From Swiss-Prot:
Mg(2+) binds at E10, D39, E52. Changing S30 to A/C/T: 100- to 1000-fold reduction in kcat. The record marks K54 as: Transition state stabilizer. It is an enzyme of class 3 (hydrolase). The gene is hje. SUPFAM superfamilies: Restriction endonuclease-like (SSF52980). This is Crossover junction endodeoxyribonuclease Hje. It comes from Saccharolobus solfataricus (strain ATCC 35092 / DSM 1617 / JCM 11322 / P2) (Sulfolobus solfataricus).
C-alpha cells in the first residue's frame, strides 16, 4: 500500500472510531520497528483495540504473520480486554470491513470472510453495556 494512501486510510479510520466514542490514535511507525506497535489503537470502556489498517481496490488483502503478531503482542502488554483487528477499506464497495485474527499467521482478508465495521461497533457496544450493568 502506498504510504500516503495508507496514512489517509489510517486517519479516516481514526476519525470513524472517534465518531463512535472511542479514544483513538494513529501510531506512525514503520513495519520494520522492533516494537509490537499496531497502526492504530483505540479504547472505549475497558476495551482496547489493536488495529492493522489496509486500503485496497482489490477484493482481497494479504496480511503477513508478523503484522498479526504485533497486534497480539501489543495487546499482551495490557491487563484490559484487548481485541486484535484487521481493518480493510474495500474501496470498490466503499466499505470498511474488519476481521478478528485468532492467531499469528498469514491471513487473506476478503469481503466474504470479514464483517462491516458497523457490526463490530454493535458487538463491542453490547459488550461494554453488559460490563457496565453487570456488577
Amino acid at each position: 500500500m502506498n504510504r500516503d494512501i495508507g496514512k489517509n486510510a489510517e486517519r479516516e479510520l481514526v476519525s470513524i472510531l472517534r465518531g463512535e466514542g472511542f479514544n483513538a490514535v494513529r501510531i506512525p511507525t514503520s513495519n520494520s520497528s522492533p516494537n509490537p506497535l499496531p497502526d492504530i489503537f483505540a479504547t472505549k470502556g475497558n476495551t482496547l483495540l489493536s488495529i492493522e489498517c489496509k486500503s485496497t481496490w482489490e477484493n482481497k488483502v494479504k496480511v503477513k504473520e508478523h503484522q498479526v503478531r504485533k497486534l497480539l503482542d501489543f495487546l499482551s502488554m495490557f491487563t484490559m480486554k484487548g481485541v486484535p483487528l484487521i481493518a480493510i477499506k474495500f474501496k470498490q464497495v466503499h466499505e470498511w470491513r474488519v476481521l478478528v485474527p485468532e492467531k499469528a499467521e498469514d491471513i487473506i482478508v476478503t469481503i466474504d470472510n470479514s464483517i462491516p465495521i458497523e457490526d463490530l461497533f454493535k458487538i463491542l457496544e453490547k459488550r461494554i453495556e453488559e460490563k457496565i450493568l453487570t456488577p
